[in-house]
């Protein structure tokens, strides 16, 4: 089963997808929340790596509208005390909050694969 990488930054998406591929896993990608919801509603994923701050729909809105019970790994540079971050972390589907920038992208792959 595939993973879904959702981030508006092309370099981050491609880096994560490449790291998962090197570990033998396939990924789909979405560059915003609207694309993510379309893919989530259409396909089944092992887990979702979801950015918070994105155009069209942000990560918080994706979680609110997402009906499937899929493990979610939040990937974000945002570390402020925004109320949405508290709601995101309280969502039972959120397994881990991963801060950008990533020091070791392969440790993220191990973490996600190990927890799904």
Positions of predicted regions on the chain:
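Active-site residues of response regulator receiver
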Residues: 51
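Charged phosphotransfer/docking patches of two-component systems
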Residues: 10-14, 82, 105
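Receiver (REC) domain switch/output surface
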Residues: 91, 104-116
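Two-component/phosphorelay signaling modules centered on CheY-like receiver
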Residues: 10-28
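Receiver (REC) domain active-site loop signature in two-component systems and cognate sites
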Residues: 54
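Acidic catalytic/metal-coordinating carboxylates
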Residues: 32-35, 58-61
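Conserved sequence signature across two-component system core domains
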Residues: 6-7, 30, 48
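Hydrophobic/aromatic residues positioned on beta-strands within the core alpha/beta folds
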Residues: 75-78
């Amino acid at each position: 089963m595939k993973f879904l990488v959702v981030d508006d930054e092309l370099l981050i998406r491609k880096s994560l997808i490449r790291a998962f591929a090197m570990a033998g896993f396939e990924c789909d990608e979405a560059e915003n929340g609207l694309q993510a919801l379309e893919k989530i509603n259409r396909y089944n994923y092992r887990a979702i790596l979801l950015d918070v701050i994105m155009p069209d729909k942000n990560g918080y809105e994706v979680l609110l509208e997402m009906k499937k019970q899929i493990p979610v790994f939040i990937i974000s540079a945002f570390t402020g005390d925004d109320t949405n971050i508290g709601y995101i972390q309280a969502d039972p589907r959120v397994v881990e909050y991963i801060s950008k920038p990533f020091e070791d992208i392969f440790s993220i792959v191990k973490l996600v694969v190990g927890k799904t």
